[in-house]
Regions:
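Active-site cores that bind ATP or allylic diphosphates and position pyrophosphate for catalysis
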Residues: 1-34
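Ribokinase/PfkB-type carbohydrate-kinase core domain
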Residues: 21-82, 89-227
């Protein structure tokens, strides 16, 4: 009625996923690429889900630095005439639990028996957040009353959501001797109850030689995430 012409071609079908996979195949080494090309994808998926089911039953201890991640949203203003700096207008703040807390929350998606062992300072703005962690996360938290928890504050451009600068509040000698002794005693008595121990060490003075020594000697399986 309106004219036109339909042509059926015999060219190979191309999909965006196939093109992307082939274009970025250099990301994988040759052995992994060969493995992925020969294995049935459904079997790989089944194997992955089986492994995740096994993880769910493990008793896991996550020990290491507690971190407060603070994001201050700001609006950049014109550069001050008298100083060569960037001036910003404060919009608002968002505070999140990082370090061992973030790791525990992520792992709790796959595991129902997690214990956190860490120390925090006298920061009042994180107590409610700690109490609101998933109930299946057990908490063994020691308090340093005269210290502050490591806090990483970022200034974020409110329009483009990009970081402008960062300020870290860190106590170089965060963990007191008394709490170090308490933690070592706890580990010595309870490490036998955990199938896996994940040590998270960001270099913020929580993991000391004594703590590392008892973890290395008495953990059934020790995984280390450090910076």
């Amino acid at each position: 009625k309106n004219g036109g012409k339909i042509v059926f071609t015999m060219s190979a079908l191309k999909s965006s996923t196939d093109i992307i996979n082939k274009s970025y195949s250099y990301i994988f080494d040759s052995k992994l690429q060969k493995f992925l090309s020969t294995k049935n994808k459904d079997l790989i998926l089944k194997d992955c889900t089986t492994q995740l089911e096994k993880i769910k039953k493990l008793r896991v201890l996550i020990i290491g630095d507690a971190i407060i991640d603070q994001y201050d949203s700001v609006k950049p203003l014109n550069k001050p005439i008298k100083e060569n700096i960037l001036a910003t207008k404060y919009i608002g703040s968002e505070v999140y639990l990082g370090g061992v807390f973030a790791a525990a929350v992520n792992l709790s998606e796959f595991n129902n028996n997690i214990t956190i062992c860490t120390a925090i300072g006298n920061d009042k703005d994180i107590k409610n957040k700690i109490n609101s962690l998933p109930k299946k996360i057990n908490k063994k938290i020691y308090i340093e009353k005269k210290k502050i928890t490591t806090r990483k504050k970022r200034l974020v451009d409110s329009a483009y959501k990009k970081k402008i600068s960062e300020v870290y509040y860190i106590e170089d000698d965060f963990l007191s001797k008394s709490n170090s002794v308490k933690i070592n005693n706890y580990l010595s008595q309870n490490l036998k109850n955990f199938d896996v121990v994940i040590m998270i060490d960001y270099g913020h003075s929580f993991i000391n030689k004594d703590i590392y020594s008892v973890l290395a000697k008495k953990s059934k399986y020790l995984a280390i995430n450090c910076q």
